[in-house]
Amino acid sequence: MNNDKRPLYISYAGPALLSTPLLNKGSAFSAEERASFNLEGLLPEATETIQEQVVRAYQQYRGFESDMDKHIYLRNIQDTNETLFYRLVQNHISEMMPIIYTPTVGAACENFSNIYRRGRGLFISYANRDRIDDLLNNAANHNVKVIVVTDGERILGLGDQGIGGMGIPIGKLSLYTACGGISPAYTLPVVLDVGTNNPQRLADPMYMGWRHPRITGPDYDNFVEEFMQAVQRRWPDALIQFEDFAQKNAMPLLERYKNRVCCFNDDIQGTAAVTVGSLLAACKAAGSQLSQQRITFLGAGSAGCGIAEAIIAQMVSEGISDEQARSQVYMVDRWGLLEEGMPNLLDFQQRLVQKKANTQHWTTENNGYSLHDVIRNAKPTVLVGVSGAPGLFSEEIIKEMHQHCPRPIVFPLSNPTSRVEALPSDIIRWTNGEALVATGSPFDPVLHEGKTYPIVQCNNSYIFPGIGLGVLAANARRVTDEMLMESSRALASCSPLAINGHGPLLPPLESIHSVSKKIAFAVAKKAIEQGVAPEVTDEALEASIEQHFWQPVYRRYKRTAF
């Protein structure tokens, strides 16, 4: 945690100090600091507090009309004065999270080269594959503890954005700090530029990435391996989060590295953890267990299958067999229900096929079973959308589900907002207010027949900042499935609906710091229990979490020659 009474000794001075975002205070430099660091005359006369700076910055922010302009403005503050940026965001977290991350970050990625102002993080091009160690040594932050890396191929639901995908690691790490208290000095966003197959990007004269079709196969795998080895040489204890890799690479990369380095995939494991946590809270509020639910997924990619496997693991922990748990989970993709004997299924999909014996008495008018067929025959109590295809949870689908389930749980999780499977307002209306709805992107509360229904954002930001904080606080060497499961349970324990029987399914973002600390403690405890972190007392662990929790306050500076 920051201690603003303890001075920080730095050698930067003059314009160089004002140009260093991690150290710049702008108008908050004291008269003594201005004299000591050659800043006199470089700043207006008034010395301000950080709260006075926040008031001005917020006034300027409110002056922008479009979300994109607001995003650009906040990114400019981040690249000028990081402490001010995080104080501003923390003061207005609910309002600004959709601007710095989903859904606005999607448009920012699509327009990355057009709105580019200043470099942040590392752009590691395939053309420089023989110099990755040198590139890592060029990073602005030297004591890196958390890396978010993407290759830009599957950015949200927007597909291949090339280096435009850098907006995602930048946004994710902003939330590691704003929500999880991880110092921005410890973070590094990385994009692996292996080209792009997006014809719009390649044809755009403004595009700033490597103009080449995507590298694939062994060349791609070797490039990622070189990067991972270089990171291990430079920062052997860093946590690496894989972000927005295409389905064909996401799961294989996770399987290849999860037992070698401290890493996880947020799209697969983070999404699974927050979804399981939300479902556990919903079940607790209803007086039931997850193992009693029948769950249908629309979308059987790596994210959907990752959520399904996490749900099955939780069901088994509640006392049912793995076989029984799998029989209660129905995966539907564009070709229909995944069934045994279907051709061309990926390895991670094979474990989630439904046995013919479970569907032999079902009725259908088609070859195979559509989503509507599954809803009608399986009678699910939970419907999860991770398809990236808008509007597929139709009125017919939702009403069919509601016929056999008085309080359906419906999670249209696809991002950004334009890709959501159904609008929350429609789901509430079609079920006469009886559905419990959570979404992947933010939506306003729904007013239906005089009653207001809060729409919870089932967002990974409830989970990954706490995981990162727990890994750092415990000095964990790996991120295990059991650690992720504990994060889900910790999140569920924070649910106002589960605790009080009313209120939102997940806690408000204004309490995200306490949520992240609770998740961090649960994750760290499990890491110690599993032997992937040094053994310490609970008291020492809590102290470590507080010590690692960075706050956006200005420290006093003292001049050093070195």
UniProtKB/Swiss-Prot annotation:
Keywords: Metal-binding, NAD, Oxidoreductase
GO biological process terms, semicolon-separated: malate metabolic process; pyruvate metabolic process
Entry's EC annotation: 1.1.1.38
Domain of life according to the entry: Bacteria
Molecular function per GO: malate dehydrogenase (decarboxylating) (NAD+) activity; malic enzyme activity; metal ion binding; NAD binding; oxaloacetate decarboxylase activity
InterPro entries cross-referenced by the UniProt entry: Aminoacid_DH-like_N_sf, Malic_enzyme_CS, Malic_N_dom, Malic_N_dom_sf, Malic_NAD-bd, Malic_OxRdtase, NAD(P)-bd_dom_sf, NAD_malic_enz_proteobac
PROSITE patterns attached to this UniProt entry: MALIC_ENZYMES
Keyword Oxidoreductase: yes
Enzyme class: oxidoreductase
Required co-factors: Mg(2+); Mn(2+)
Gene Ontology cellular component terms for the protein in this record: cytosol
Signal peptide from the UniProt entry: none
Family: Belongs to the malic enzymes family.
HAMAP family per the UniProt record, alphabetical: NAD_malic_enz (MF_01619)
Descriptive protein name: NAD-dependent malic enzyme
Source organism per UniProt: Vibrio cholerae serotype O1 (strain ATCC 39315 / El Tor Inaba N16961)
Lineage, top ranks: Bacteria, Pseudomonadati, Pseudomonadota, Gammaproteobacteria, Vibrionales
